[in-house]
């Protein structure tokens, strides 16, 4: 008879769901598919049960057969490598009833030397539903504040307290200016103003304009020679008109 499968108990699932295990004595790049089970089956691992079949094999020091072959001939809690794609390894915790019948209990993934418990379907769906329902609950609570009822009009909306977009932009602008002011201290402001006043005193704007005018007068632009088109062709004097006699 197969054991009844259902959502795991929250009292057993919640503590280990947010836990992790890491053995500092094992470098992360040293872990591969051949020794990942040895890394997982550690007494300090919170996900590892000491009464499992893997622990019995380690205590008996069986070396003439592979671990998978030994586990197929044993019954009880077992840990097997389910998937391998370095640096990711997935370990399955299962209950073996006979040589051909196993019931998965939980999955764990090992990545870069850290062991974490994979969420089951019940926990995953519950988390997604809570993540979707919480914004809806906040939205309905916000909408309820603007709902009004009148015997003549019935239900209607009233958004008098809703701030306008222009006001929001002004508040945002003031906040940005306030942040810019907070970046400098009073000493820095006073020091900057003193340096600017000193520069204006040493190099006033009027003297700079006068010097610029003097330079332009000292270096007058050379007169351009008139072009041939402006001079035109030479004109000859016309002969005096002959006197007419009657």
Swiss-Prot record:
Subunit structure: Component of the Mediator complex. Interacts with let-19/mdt-13. Interacts with RNA polymerase II. Interacts with mdt-28.
Residue segments, region Disordered: 165-186, 207-246
Gene: mdt-6
Disulphide bridges: none
The protein's role, per its UniProt record: Component of the Mediator complex, a coactivator involved in the regulated transcription of nearly all RNA polymerase II-dependent genes. Mediator functions as a bridge to convey information from gene-specific regulatory proteins to the basal RNA polymerase II transcription machinery. Mediator is recruited to promoters by direct interactions with regulatory proteins and serves as a scaffold for the assembly of a functional preinitiation complex with RNA polymerase II and the general transcription factors.
GO MF annotation list: transcription coactivator activity
Cellular component aspect of the GO annotation: core mediator complex; mediator complex
InterPro entries given in the database record: Mediator_Med6, Mediator_Med6_met/pln, Mediator_Med6_sf
A UniProt-annotated Pfam family: Med6
Comp. bias (Basic and acidic residues): 166-184, 208-224
GO BP annotations, alphabetical order: regulation of transcription by RNA polymerase II
Keywords: Activator, Nucleus, Transcription, Transcription regulation
Annotated compartments: Nucleus
Listed name of the protein: Mediator of RNA polymerase II transcription subunit 6
Family: Belongs to the Mediator complex subunit 6 family.
The keyword Protein transport is annotated on this UniProt entry: no
């Amino acid at each position: 008879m197969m054991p009844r499968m259902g959502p795991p108990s929250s009292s057993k699932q919640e503590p280990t769901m947010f836990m992790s295990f890491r053995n500092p004595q094992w470098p992360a790049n040293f872990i591969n598919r051949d020794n990942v089970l040895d890394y997982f089956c550690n007494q300090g691992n919170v996900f590892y049960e000491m009464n499992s079949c893997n622990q019995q094999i380690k205590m008996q020091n069986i070396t003439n057969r592979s671990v998978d072959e030994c586990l197929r001939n044993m019954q009880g809690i077992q840990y097997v490598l389910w998937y391998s794609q370095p640096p990711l390894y997935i370990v399955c915790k299962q209950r073996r009833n006979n040589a051909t019948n196993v019931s998965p209990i939980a999955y764990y993934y090992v990545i870069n030397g850290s062991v974490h418990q994979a969420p089951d379907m019940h926990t995953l769906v519950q988390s997604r539903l809570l993540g979707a329902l919480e914004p809806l609950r906040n939205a309905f609570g916000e909408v309820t504040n603007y709902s009004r009822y009148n015997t003549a009009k019935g239900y209607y909306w009233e958004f008098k307290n809703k701030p306008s977009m222009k006001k929001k932009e002004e508040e945002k602008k003031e906040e940005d200016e306030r942040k810019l002011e907070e970046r400098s201290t009073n000493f820095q402001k006073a020091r900057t103003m003193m340096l600017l006043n000193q520069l204006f005193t040493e190099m006033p704007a009027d003297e700079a304009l006068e010097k610029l005018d003097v330079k332009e007068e000292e270096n007058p632009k050379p007169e351009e020679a008139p072009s041939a088109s402006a001079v035109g062709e030479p004109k000859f004097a016309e002969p005096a008109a002959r006197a007419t006699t009657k």
